[in-house]
Amino acid sequence: MCASFQTTEEFAALQLQGMRAAAQPTSGDEETAPGVAQTRQWFEAEPLWFKRAVFYEIHIRGFFDSNGDGYGDFRGLSEKLDYLQWLGIDCIWLLPFYESPLRDGGYDIADFYKVHHDYGTVEDVRQLIDAAHARRIRVIADLVMNHTSSDHPWFQESRSSPDNPKRDWYVWSDTYDRYQDARIIFVDTEASNWTWDPVAGQYYWHRFFSHQPDLNYDNPEVQQAMLDVLRFWLDLGLDGFRLDAVPYLYEREGTICENLPETHAFLKRVRKEIEENYPDRVLLAEANQWPADVVEYFGEDGDECQMCFHFPVMPRMFMALRREQATPIYEILDHTPPIPEHCQWGLFLRNHDELTLEMVTDEERDYMYSEYAKDPRMKLNLGIRRRLAPLLDNGRDEIELMTAILFSLPGSPVLYYGDEIAMGDNVFLGDRDGVRTPMQWSPDRNGGFSRADFAQLYAPPLMDPVYGFQAVNVEAELRTPTSLLRWMHRFIQLRKEHPVFGFGTYEPIPTSNPRIFALIRRFEDDLVLCVHNLARSAQAVELDLAAFRGRVPVELFGNSRFPAIGELPYLLTLARRGFYWFALEAPENENSNA
């Protein structure tokens, strides 16, 4: 079997010895190591794995450089799998790694079948997947279905001649006045969704950057080509895809060209392919829309994507924290429709993009800018390009509280690489690069990310006194029992011990204090009460728990038993930015009767 670590101290000792991989298997281990087929059997036995999973998003370029060229790569990621196994994550989400001119961080794909040379080879990807699977870690990857790079051979052929067989693979027009109701997404950089191409002698359609022409999904050949891409990577062992920019696949006059019926019809076709040939794989939709629109991407009875990101809940968590009011969280959850039982929301605090403010009012957006983006360089498009720790002023209590709320909500949490050690950002780097700096492994050269000369690095590591790699790194936090990293490890393990967080229902709990966010998670006979204090000061609260009278709250972290719930409101006092998670145990006589 693969090496595993019984304690944090064992892993820390190995890491501090400078070992790139935590342990090498002995000959006996090799004989008993699970094969690819056996691992896949394990995975297929748990088709709803994504409902209880903790995801971890990785920018390959910024994670670990194995060959000293200044760029993170697949072999480097493979060397760090034992760290991820120890941390407790269940699934790695990879940002785009395909061949690309990298004008948009890899979301401008020039070849769906090739790996960017900085990252390695297709064989390196296969080896990573096999090594992750051996540790019971799944791997999903971004797939950009909506568009390609303008450097893609498909587009080069399409623009070359009106008679080219691939001319109709993209959306061309003699004028730029079609689809006028469609909004411009990148308002900072694009003035139109149409761009003139002098070679083609026509305008081409793009919902994002002008160097990212949209594919024409009205062409059956395009649909088949994208299905072929999916099959290629799934056959390699990938466990699924995060479908980027999925609402924009089709265009129709008189609409905003988003969430169209034709898009859902194609997604049903994709899901049918998955169900018939890859039954344990997952599709995660990126649809930055209101929940009432996003639920359509689960499909009728869950026949489209198994998971969808819940974007609007994220800015409201930050809003609730600064306002010290739970109302924004309650309201967005109240406006979230039910989803099919075998589907799941994807939830996150931060990711590789800006903290999007598209799904808030103008007044709320101005408030968020005034609180979290006081420097104009922190703004990007309709969002804030900052990491979690700087957003929260590096407050340990705030980071723990926001993580606790995230983990308590109905959905599967997604962590962004480096947030487990409170990495900072660099607002002086352009575009979104400020939140994609190198992972900080140690206080050594380049933060332990790379042996390359500083000038060779794809981006400079952080070196300021608060967030720089000499102050914030994995090695230092492994040494410290009270570090955020060690806390995060324990917290992930705690959540995984309670299936109610992955499979349970959500019930808001009435409170006497608007600064308290309280909820019940219920799954079969398990009940967990989560109470969070959003205030900067200690708060007392009375909870209406009469429906659970007789049950005994047992605090999950310390296993402390609190007084049994009675008819009267239940009184708690929480520290500033504090929280409690309780298992509500049935009375002993009820258990004995059972």
Give residue spans per PLM region.
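Active-site and adjacent substrate-binding regions of carbohydrate-active enzymes
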Residues: 1-594
